[in-house]
Curated annotation (Swiss-Prot):
Gene Ontology terms: biological process: response to stress
Regions crossing the membrane: 1-21
UniProt entry tagged with the keyword Repressor: no
Membrane-topology descriptor: Single-pass membrane protein
Entry GO MF terms: ATP binding; ATP hydrolysis activity
EC number: 3.6.1.-
Protein's UniProt name: AAA-ATPase At2g46620
Entries under SMART domains matching the protein: AAA
Disordered as annotated region, ranges: 423-460
Length: 491
């Protein structure tokens, strides 16, 4: 009986001790250490193989597999079990998104086999993912597992309709190597509300631009048959505030493309620009704004020929297909027409100051007004030559959006001020012209009396011939330029 009692007490004490050990393990980090030791012991009995997926290939172009692995891993529930995970706010304020941190491990299972992914980073800052898989499982699951990643990431990409705006960063000397390895693009969500439905533009021109873009979207086989790169380029030119940037946003929303906004002030030279363009993805709109301003101020070592040569050079065939390139300028008169020939720039679209048709579109968009008793007065002022940019008129309407009548009166006052300014300018020009012509007449009379005739060789006639020759040169240059926007309007 005593032996049984002793055995019972020993069992009771052992059970209590195990219970205390269990509590100790779960309440402290010892359980983590036990799991870690267990994993290391198992690893001693298995041979593993490692596969690295770098973010960029040897040509510094984006590795699409890296992006697919990135999307796939961040969708795994096991990311919560990683030792270090980043938390971000999602689209909704109460939504929390988990992202794997650098040099952290996340586990996954496929067809009964366990694999691990390491979010790595090399010494030079190049990012990568490393797949750790048992050699015994490699032949059985590797191919189908990678295909599984492709399938899941494609489904995630289709559900994620968020567009992105990519911005290039500059090269700092102490981070030169690292930034080149990591890429020079940084992205933010692109949610610009502008569309072709609410943009102020002539209806016929808008419809023809939309038709041109739709033809481009369906043109992959056509471009391949012609042996041309599947891309298209646009030149948008006109004064500031006429809607060029809004038009780019409308294009991106219509095409459902990401946007790459190139800041030339952060580009070192033509070679650096080419490397930037090589790192862009397909299905994107690549924008270089205010091109003439950058070139005139010499704020960058990039030149116009270097930019436009890329669009029709052999190197452009090495980049992703299905891209739209857009250049914006305030005017193209100072640009050599050969620089803007077809093949380099396919479509030229002029953005003029606001006219009455565009004004009615703005009034409808900003004020919800399609007709108003003051419209006839506004139309008359436009017909007299007054004009403002759509941005200026839009700001007046926003400031007075609670009262359409007050907003229209402010627009009328601004237009009248502009008309008076233009009228004063024309009068001064006419007065200066009449004074100049009078002085030239006196000069001709004096030269005739002194030289005994010979009016054909007088300085005034020479100046007139020189001016006439200059006008002929400018006229010939203008007639030789290729402007699809004008063709669209005439057609």
């Amino acid at each position: 009986m005593g032996i049984l009692w002793d055995s019972f007490l020993l069992l009771l004490v052992s059970t209590f001790a195990l219970f205390l050990v269990r509590i100790l393990l779960f309440k402290t980090g010892l359980i983590y250490m036990v799991k870690l030791w267990r994993r290391k012991i198992i690893d001693w009995f298995h041979v593993y193989q490692f596969y690295k997926v770098p973010e960029f290939n040897d040509n510094v172009q984006e590795n699409h597999l890296y992006q697919k692995v990135y999307m796939y891993l961040n969708s795994l529930s096991s990311i919560e079990n990683s030792d270090f995970t980043n938390l971000f706010t999602g689209k909704k304020s109460n939504e929390i998104i988990l992202r794997l941190d650098r040099n952290q491990v996340v586990g996954d299972e496929f067809l009964g086999a366990r694999v691990c992914w390491i979010n790595g980073e090399d010494e030079d800052g190049a990012r990568n993912f490393v797949l750790k898989i048992r050699k015994a499982d490699k032949r059985r699951i590797l191919g189908s597992y990678l295909q599984h990643i492709h399938t899941v990431s494609d489904e995630l990409e289709q559900r994620n309709t968020e567009l992105k705006l990519f911005i290039n960063v500059g090269i700092d000397d102490h981070l030169n190597k690292k930034k080149k390895k990591n890429g020079r693009w940084r992205s933010i969500p692109f949610d610009h509300p502008c569309t072709f439905d609410n943009i102020a533009m002539e209806t016929d021109l808008k419809n023809k631009v939309k038709s041109d873009l739709e033809s481009f979207l369906k043109g992959k086989q056509y471009y391949n048959r012609l042996g041309r790169v599947w891309k298209r380029s646009y030149l948008l030119y006109g004064p500031s505030g006429t809607g060029k940037s809004s038009f780019v946003a409308a294009m991106a929303n219509f095409l459902d493309y990401d946007v790459y906004d190139i800041d030339l002030s952060k580009v070192v030279d033509d070679s650096d620009l080419k490397m930037l363009l090589l790192q862009t993805r397909g299905k994107s709109v690549i924008v270089i704004e205010d091109l003439d301003r950058h070139l005139s101020t010499k704020s960058t070592a990039v030149n116009l020929s270097g930019i436009l040569n890329f669009t029709d050079s052999i190197l452009s065939s090495c980049t992703a297909d299905e891209r739209i390139m857009v250049f914006t300028m305030t005017g193209k008169e100072q640009i050599d027409p050969a620089m803007l020939r077809p093949g380099r720039v396919d479509v030229h679209i002029h953005f003029p100051l606001c006219d009455f048709t565009a004004f009615k579109t703005l009034a409808n968009n900003y004020l919800g007004v399609k007709e108003h008793k003051l419209f006839s007065q506004v139309e008359g002022i436009f017909q007299n030559g007054a004009s403002l940019s759509p941005a200026e008129i839009g700001e007046l309407m926003i400031a007075n959006r609670n009262s359409p009548t007050r907003a229209l009166k402010h627009v009328i006052n601004a237009l009248q001020t502009d008309g008076d300014r233009r009228g004063t300018g024309r009068r001064l020009l006419l007065e200066n012209g009449s004074r100049k012509s009078t002085s030239e007449d006196v000069s001709d009379d004096m030269s005739g009396s002194l030289c005994g005739g010979g009016g054909g060789s007088s300085p005034a006639v020479k100046e007139f011939r020189k001016l006439y020759g200059l006008l002929r040169i400018k006229s010939s240059r203008k007639s030789g330029s290729f402007d699809v926007a004008r063709e669209m309007r005439d057609g």
